[in-house]
Amino acid sequence: MDRREFTASLVAGGCAGMCVDLTLFPLDTIKTRLQSQQGFYKAGGFRGIYAGVPSAAIGSFPNAAAFFVTYESTKSVFSGYTTTNLAPITHMLAASLGEIVACLIRVPTEVVKQRTQANPSISTYRVLLNSLQEEGFRGLYRGYGSTVLREIPFSLVQFPLWEYLKAVWWRRQGGRLDSWQAAVCGALAGGVAAFVTTPLDVAKTWIMLAKAGTSTASGNIPMVLCEVWRSRGIPGLFAGSIPRVMFISMGGFIFLGAYEKVRRTLL
């Protein structure tokens, strides 16, 4: 990957991330409150659906930029060593590495954002200060493991499926795809990936919102999933799946469509 491609991926990824996170923030708030242990209405219901948006705004650009720079760089490195049949494996590896890097930026902003969403009467700044006072800087990374373990399976489904759908559409029309077509493929791939990984998203939300020192806050994903299963059953494991699928399908359309458009413009 040369400098021009690097810059294009950086800017396109950052712009795409900002577009999605700010446009669809209310759906994300509703999803978080549906998944919280205290329940939807106690967590704020439909009140203050933009609570936590400053945290999302700060983290969106660098988070998405870090993902796509890593994703495109990894694809570029392995492109000369793999055949067409092995392309999905390259996409899976690239997406996994991208998520590991991006989560270093995403998790602290996600922790603050979700705690503010679940406590809309408290400002983002106050939530940040409280988190630092109670748990220190390390507390901002609570849920890093659960976030990575949610994002990697998600990306293992979304990005190979996105690339596959684009390739099929490209072959059928015998030429280059428009950005809106890449966006449609992104919406379909994102919706499928969002639904199948909802239980992991529920576990991540419980871990991030748990009080410091509790067993849930320890970050043991299998234990948290069992706790959700025992207390709420299958509906609990898929709590928030409808807004999550809606959010990520629309997000996939905007995110991947905007990414393709901006990147092609810069190249």
Curated annotation (Swiss-Prot):
- Which parts pass through the membrane? 5-25, 49-69, 85-105, 142-162, 182-202, 238-258
Its localization reads:
Mitochondrion inner membrane
Q: Which GO terms describe its molecular function?
A: S-adenosyl-L-methionine transmembrane transporter activity; S-adenosyl-L-methionine:S-adenosyl-L-homocysteine antiporter activity
Q: Which SUPFAM superfamilies match?
A: Mitochondrial carrier (SSF103506)
Q: Does the keyword Transmembrane helix apply?
A: yes
- Alphabetic keyword roster: Antiport, Membrane, Mitochondrion, Mitochondrion inner membrane, Repeat, S-adenosyl-L-methionine, Transmembrane, Transmembrane helix, Transport
Q: Which GO terms describe its cellular component?
A: mitochondrial inner membrane; mitochondrion
Membrane topology, as annotated, equals: Multi-pass membrane protein
Family label: Belongs to the mitochondrial carrier (TC 2.A.29) family.
- Function noted in UniProt: Mitochondrial S-adenosyl-L-methionine/S-adenosyl-L-homocysteine antiporter. Mediates the exchange of cytosolic S-adenosyl-L-methionine, the predominant methyl-group donor for macromolecule methylation processes, for mitochondrial S-adenosylhomocysteine(SAH), a by-product of methylation reactions.
Identification of the protein by name? Mitochondrial S-adenosylmethionine carrier protein
Which organism is the protein's source? Danio rerio
Upper classification of the organism? Eukaryota, Metazoa, Chordata, Craniata, Vertebrata
